[in-house]
């Protein structure tokens, strides 16, 4: 359904809102009801080139701004974000569909990264060692790279961009942001508040679009580094194409996160934790719990409680505080998820909770879905479904649970529920995952730690946030000096 007040999105280049040089646009839809709420331009390479030139020009002066002054501007930006928390959450729920509770959580996690970026004077400090030889001192200095870019996904339209441009800009770089064409409204709001904070024009530039914009970023010689978050095939493409063009690239990709449930866990808290991790944000997050590997001794009790509690969850428009599961992002994704559920049934998994027909009249909804007796041969175990679909695999012991999780091509996050320090230590040492939780439902690190997975969940060397983020957005100069 097309609404009469649908917003026309614009690019933001060199401090001004400008139309794309391309003629095409894409509908932005509220996934809770299918209404068109905006039109995002499908920009062309010439738009990217304009943005890069603006950023390149701004870099000449921005890189010379004292680091404390950059941090002060970011603090003003932080204050504006804090003042508009509720409005930002409302935009997220409107264009992404996640519940207001989840949207508020996303807003807070994004703000925490800006808080980190305000500490740049400390984070960018170099190293020094006097008297490395007779009368000679050595030191390491950090400098910005130049123009850098970020390509961000639909599922966290606030948090993921804030993983990127605040820290990059704090380090003295200028930035070109390409948000998902499915969730462009929040990106526009982030840019609006950025310039309201007083930043010079051209420091942050916004270009909407699809693959043409992505390729324009990856192949532009003036862009020195690219940050990406999205699906595994696209992450691999971004990494290979970007590095082939001489860029530094971090590409965060897909996931199939496992939670191992031990017999000595706190059963009630474990069940509630897995429900939140599996079905929160409609399962559309790279840190969602996709598989519960449950030790046989507790499996029946676990399933009984899990099924009972999951059936209490309500599905619907994220604006209702009663709803736990919101819509999926688009109809095409909903159909893909339904195909996976059909596949699980055909391959012999036991459908314990069927979310295919929630009592919702419009929108792209699939309710919380649980499969029991899943095996590694099944597609629902192998593939990232990106939906509120949980697979339960029964294992004999911790060793089998770890072996199961490590078979996955993905290695983003993993969790163990246990009261045994020995089991937790074994899990920590043997599991192949970039981010690990012990009785922590979603082991997404705080902003001062790095965020990245292993194997097909991450392409690159340096993750986002924390010290990794500063290293990614800076280059080092090692200075050896002697004075006569």
Curated annotation (Swiss-Prot):
SUPFAM superfamilies given in the database record: ALDH-like
Uppermost EC category: oxidoreductase
Active site (record annotation): 286 (nucleophile)
Highest taxon, organism lineage: Bacteria
Catalytic activity field: 3-oxopropanoate + NAD(+) + CoA + H2O = hydrogencarbonate + acetyl-CoA + NADH + H(+); 2-methyl-3-oxopropanoate + NAD(+) + CoA + H2O = propanoyl-CoA + hydrogencarbonate + NADH + H(+)
Protein name: Malonate-semialdehyde dehydrogenase 1
Lineage, opening ranks: Bacteria, Bacillati, Bacillota, Bacilli, Bacillales
Entry's EC annotation: 1.2.1.27
Family designation: Belongs to the aldehyde dehydrogenase family. IolA subfamily.
